[in-house]
Every structure is written in structure tokens, then in C-alpha cells.
């Protein structure tokens, strides 16, 4: 994997062509340029380009200002629409929120627990210790585990708390919770 330096305007343009959460900059550029690795051999751009000039690291495309757009794209995605169970939609939303801002997600989940239950933990065992019937599942693409034997209303409440903590607009929170 190589890194390249791009200005903010170009980065925003590339980011605006994101089709799904977690899509890499390489995937976006390949699609935009209609380029596939199998169709053309890699050729150096110039012999004068030196590795020391390559400064910026390639980032996953999810800038803070596009987090609302990213959540809306999740709701419109085929992957989300194909989920028949509320628990699967719940896990997809959690994965997306984590990918947008893992620090804010961590802060939100630390303050989220019931009177007698812990909802999120770093390992399955912690959740099982707080209730034998919790049915913990790992949130895909994250280090978090979440209990899943709660009713849909509780799952919505958990997502609402996290999204409010991450400062999403109220109408988007309502829309997301309505789809779970």
C-alpha cells in the first residue's frame, strides 16, 4: 500500500463519491477511473518521484462533515434493506457509527447501561457475567460486544443515545431508530 498527498478539495471530492461505509480511497478511485488491477499493469508515474516526497497517509473516506451523509447512505443501501431482522440492522448501524467516530462512539457506550445491565463491553464474558441470557454479539468491525436479547424499543433507545451523544441531527436519529 502506498500513500499519496492530496489537497483538501480533492479529498472532499473523492469522499463525495463514497458508496458504502468503510470503502477505501483506492476502491473509490478505481471505480471513478474505471480501472481494475487485472486490466492494466502497474506503471510508475515518473522516475523523478521519490518515496520521501510521499507524505500523507491514505485514509478511510469518512470525514466528520460527511457523517450525516454516511448514515443516510447506510439507510439507502442494499445491504441494509436486505436485513430481515432488527438485530442485524441494529448491528449495521452500530458498525457505521463506530466507523465514523470511534472515540465519540466509545464515550457514548461507556455511559450507556441499564439499572442492572451492561449493554456494551470489550469482551463477551463481561456481558455474560451481567446476565446469563444476554445473547452477546460482537459489533462487526469493532472491538465492542453488545447484548442483543433486548426488545426492539431498547435497541432503538441505545442507538438514539449513541447518536445524540455523537451530535447527529434529531430528524436523522428519528429516521434511523424508525428503521430498526
Swiss-Prot record:
Single Gene Ontology MF annotation: sequence-specific DNA binding
Gene3D superfamilies found in the cross-reference section: Met repressor-like, Replication modulator SeqA, C-terminal DNA-binding domain
Any GO CC annotation of this UniProt entry: cytoplasm
The UniProt record lists the keyword DNA-binding: yes
SUPFAM superfamilies: Replication modulator SeqA, C-terminal DNA-binding domain (SSF82808), Ribbon-helix-helix (SSF47598)
Keyword Transferase among UniProt keywords: no
Protein family: Belongs to the SeqA family.
Binding partners and assembly: Homodimer. Polymerizes to form helical filaments.
Name under which the protein is recorded: Negative modulator of initiation of replication
Source species: Enterobacter sp. (strain 638)
Annotated gene: seqA
Amino acid at each position: 500500500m502506498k500513500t499519496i498527498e492530496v489537497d483538501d478539495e480533492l479529498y472532499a471530492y473523492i469522499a463525495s463519491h463514497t458508496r458504502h461505509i468503510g470503502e477505501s480511497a483506492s476502491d473509490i478511485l478505481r471505480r471513478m477511473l474505471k480501472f481494475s488491477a487485472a486490466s492494466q499493469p502497474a506503471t510508475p508515474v515518473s522516475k523523478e518521484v521519490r518515496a520521501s516526497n510521499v507524505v500523507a497517509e491514505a485514509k478511510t473516506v469518512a470525514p466528520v462533515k460527511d457523517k450525516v451523509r454516511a448514515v443516510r447512505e447506510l439507510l439507502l443501501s442494499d445491504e441494509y434493506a436486505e436485513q430481515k431482522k432488527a438485530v442485524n440492522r441494529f448491528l449495521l448501524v452500530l458498525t457505521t457509527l463506530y466507523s465514523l467516530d470511534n472515540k465519540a462512539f466509545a464515550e457514548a457506550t461507556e455511559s450507556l447501561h441499564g439499572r442492572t445491565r451492561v449493554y456494551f463491553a470489550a469482551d463477551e464474558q463481561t456481558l455474560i457475567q451481567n446476565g446469563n441470557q444476554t445473547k452477546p454479539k460482537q459489533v462487526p468491525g469493532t472491538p465492542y460486544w453488545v447484548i442483543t436479547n433486548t426488545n426492539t424499543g431498547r435497541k432503538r433507545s441505545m442507538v438514539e443515545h449513541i447518536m445524540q451523544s455523537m451530535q447527529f441531527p434529531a430528524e436523522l436519529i428519528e429516521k434511523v431508530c424508525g428503521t430498526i
